[in-house]
């Protein structure tokens, strides 16, 4: 699907195999990955804890039968730093806002992101905290992690290495 995401990560967890996720959502998730990769703590992976859901399964896990997950325009994500620890939900939300996500919700240990708009969803914009029920957050940008001050990318015939602030944050052998 993309460099950091596979279609199977987005498939409905009930076993129905529904997996018609929006390519625009996946592209925006790649933007989140790219932003975190440029921070001093890097990005090891973004894990999709919930992608598309069928209308039967979504209410069973706290959603609705016609929510953004059922439309293929939402994902619940956890972002891991290069050292394997997690970014906090507020940092993920801040980066998602910077990347243009229009639906963002803080969750315990994860962050809901979606690409709702007036054509595909009842309310075109929503920032909230699902932990507290506060559905009127105006911005998360105060939690935006800083970018690295130096970066380099090197490639040999068989290895791609990305360094930020002197630390290797990504390495892939081909």
Residues of each region from the PLM?
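The substrate-binding groove and active-site-proximal loops of carbohydrate-active enzymes
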Residues: 16-20, 74-81
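Catalytic cores and adjacent binding grooves of peptidoglycan-active enzymes
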Residues: 66, 71, 79-165, 170
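A broad, low-specificity signal marking well-ordered, structured residues that form hydrophobic/aromatic
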Residues: 46, 75, 111
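Surface-exposed patches in mature extracellular/periplasmic domains of secreted proteins
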Residues: 40-51, 101-108
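Short, surface-exposed glycine/acidic/tryptophan-bearing loops
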Residues: 49-76
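N-terminal accessory interaction module
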Residues: 173-174
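Active-site acidic/histidine clusters and adjacent loop/turn architecture
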Residues: 1-45
């Amino acid at each position: 699907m993309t460099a950091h995401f596979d279609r199977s990560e987005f498939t409905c967890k009930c076993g129905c195999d529904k997996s018609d996720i929006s390519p625009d959502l996946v592209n925006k998730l790649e933007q989140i990955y790219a932003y975190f990769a440029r921070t001093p703590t890097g990005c090891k992976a973004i894990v999709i804890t919930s992608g598309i859901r069928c209308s039967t399964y979504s209410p069973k896990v706290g959603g609705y039968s016609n929510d953004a997950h059922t439309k293929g325009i939402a994902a619940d994500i956890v972002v891991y730093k290069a050292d394997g620890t997690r970014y906090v939900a507020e940092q993920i939300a801040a980066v998602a806002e910077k990347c243009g996500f229009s639906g963002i919700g803080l969750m315990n240990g994860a962050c809901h992101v979606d690409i709702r708009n007036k054509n595909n969803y009842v309310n075109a914009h929503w920032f909230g905290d699902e932990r507290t029920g506060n559905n009127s957050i105006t911005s998360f940008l105060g939690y935006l992690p800083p970018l690295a001050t130096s970066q380099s990318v090197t490639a040999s015939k068989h290895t791609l290495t990305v360094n930020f602030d002197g630390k290797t944050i990504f390495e892939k052998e081909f």
